[in-house]
């Protein structure tokens, strides 16, 4: 099959090189109706030229494709469904296109396979979702097709491995073709065609948060997390999800964390994208090592200068790998903390709402308890003891700390706590076998809001669990429905801890506590090495 595709595309190529103007013709030559196509479509980097080329194919020649991709990020990723070029979709994340994808799903324009977590989708590339054709993005290539993927390697090795070794075709877009690549990230014998775009591939600055946007309420939740969870369990190995709440934690480490005497005791080893808001903690000596899923726009020079912290190649640039980092997050991290849009009374959380289907990204994987884990650590053992004190210690399984953090009322004053997740309504509307729940309640160990911390590990039954959640739900309808006496008993047992129970005065949650209060401050911390995207520069 591959030989026939190569022969069909041969007239368009000089060796492996295909002109950008012929990219659409190349796809028409190698694709067959109904085939599986994997396009990058990553969390951050995008094979944007190839996405546009695919959206421009003749739908009479190429139609009914089954798209398997990590991220639905660009408009072209959905244009192919509107034009009938693609029919079925299996994916993980769709943040920038969350509203449009919802409309297409509700309108029958997309046949949904499933919404996955990254590692789950990657696994299926090798079992039942193996791509016939992969469209990938790299920085540069040489004449033999050796690729340099640079800091944003991300998903590329996984996609190429699954496709190239199962009779598939790999097509790479590159910024330029060079005589010698700085580093061979993908060997040329796995790449069949190279399209020179003449410009860098698009990268979404997904993990950049302007400290100016951090509120005092978010600072309070960060203080609670640091003192009530990080310090309590001695969390050294961790992952932070996206959001202002976790950005606040990062910016409080050199100030509030220092005041608590926690340097060297917490937050030393990370599975994390290079968050700009972590720069002050790195420069203050908090961080020993970071392995990255991908890079972040503007962080390249800073990473080169801090090869003592980041994983870098001989050329000095970051080597990221989403599959490996997701594995590290699953098995080698003791804590995941992230935000969500909705939490129900069982602790299930989801980012699906009535109008948005953002997908999950890595959260279901990072926020799950790895039952195959066998190595002990202090936080893991302590959490396991809180969950199950009766089992003998030598036989007691530890627990990963999975923390959901947020304000009781979120964007547009929408309550974070709900009786029923919108994900259930979506499942009913689309006749799905499984509701798209991001983190299941039995994996969630703590819920943090401005009202305090609910420790779900210590709940003895479903009623206690429900009221622990109600107890930190504030003035939402869920919070107002609490049994005050039961909530107070839970507080007496330490299941619920208010700020004052931890010696935290809410009035101390002041923006002056942040180690950086603007993007410009982050640039200063980096000694000018961090080059923020233009949208974040106001000076």
Regions found by a protein language model. Name each.
Residues 1-539:
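Conserved alpha/beta enzyme-core scaffold
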């Amino acid at each position: 099959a591959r030989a026939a595709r190569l022969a069909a595309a041969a007239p368009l190529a000089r060796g492996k090189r295909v002109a950008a103007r012929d990219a659409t013709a190349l796809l028409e030559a190698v694709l067959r109706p109904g085939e599986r196509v994997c396009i990058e479509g990553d969390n951050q980097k995008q094979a944007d030229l190839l996405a546009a080329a695919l959206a421009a194919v003749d739908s009479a020649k190429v139609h009914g494709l089954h798209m398997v991709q990590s991220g639905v990020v660009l408009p072209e990723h959905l244009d192919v469904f509107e034009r009938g070029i693609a029919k079925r979709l299996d994916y993980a994340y769709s943040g920038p296109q969350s509203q449009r994808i919802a409309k297409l799903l509700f309108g029958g324009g997309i046949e949904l396979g499933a919404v996955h977590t990254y590692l789950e989708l990657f696994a299926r590339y090798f079992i039942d979702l193996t791509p016939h054709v992969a469209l990938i993005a790299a920085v540069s290539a040489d004449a033999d097709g050796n690729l340099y993927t640079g800091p944003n390697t991300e998903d590329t090795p996984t996609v190429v491995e699954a496709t190239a070794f199962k009779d598939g075709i790999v097509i790479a877009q590159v910024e330029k073709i060079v005589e010698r690549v700085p580093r061979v990230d993908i060997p040329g014998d796995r790449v069949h065609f190279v399209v020179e775009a003449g410009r860098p591939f698009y990268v979404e600055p997904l993990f950049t948060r302007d400290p100016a946007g951090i509120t005092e309420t978010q600072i309070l939740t960060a203080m609670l997390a640091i003192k009530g969870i990080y310090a309590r369990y001695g969390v050294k190995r961790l992952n932070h999800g996206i959001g202002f709440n976790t950005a606040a934690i990062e910016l409080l480490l050199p100030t509030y964390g220092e005041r608590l005497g926690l340097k060297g005791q917490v937050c030393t080893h990370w599975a994390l994208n290079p968050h700009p808001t972590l720069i002050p903690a790195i420069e203050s000596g908090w961080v020993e090592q970071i392995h990255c899923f991908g890079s972040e726009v503007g962080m390249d020079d800073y990473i080169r200068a801090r090869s003592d912290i980041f994983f870098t190649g001989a050329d000095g640039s970051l080597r990221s790998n989403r599959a490996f980092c997701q594995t590290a997050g699953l098995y080698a991290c003791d804590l995941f903390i992230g935000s969500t849009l909705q939490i129900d009374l069982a602790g299930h959380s989801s980012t699906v709402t009535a109008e948005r289907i953002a997908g999950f990204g890595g959260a279901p994987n990072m926020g799950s308890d790895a039952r195959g884990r066998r190595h002990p650590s202090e936080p893991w053992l302590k959490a396991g003891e809180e969950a199950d004190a009766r089992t003998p210690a030598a036989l007691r399984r530890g627990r990963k700390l999975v923390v959901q953090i947020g304000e009781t009322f979120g964007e547009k004053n929408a309550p974070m706590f709900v009786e029923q997740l919108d994900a259930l309504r979506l499942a009913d509307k689309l006749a799905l076998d499984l509701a798209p729940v991001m983190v299941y309640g039995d994996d969630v160990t703590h819920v943090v809001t401005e009202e305090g911390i609910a420790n779900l590990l210590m709940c003895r039954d479903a009623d206690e669990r429900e009221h622990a959640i109600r107890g930190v739900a504030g003035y939402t309808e869920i919070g107002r429905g609490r049994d005050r006496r039961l909530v107070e008993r839970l507080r007496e047992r330490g299941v619920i801890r208010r700020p004052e129970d931890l010696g935290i005065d809410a009035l101390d949650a002041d923006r002056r506590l942040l180690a950086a209060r603007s993007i410009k401050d982050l640039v200063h911390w980096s000694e000018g090495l961090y080059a923020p995207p233009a949208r974040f520069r106001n000076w």
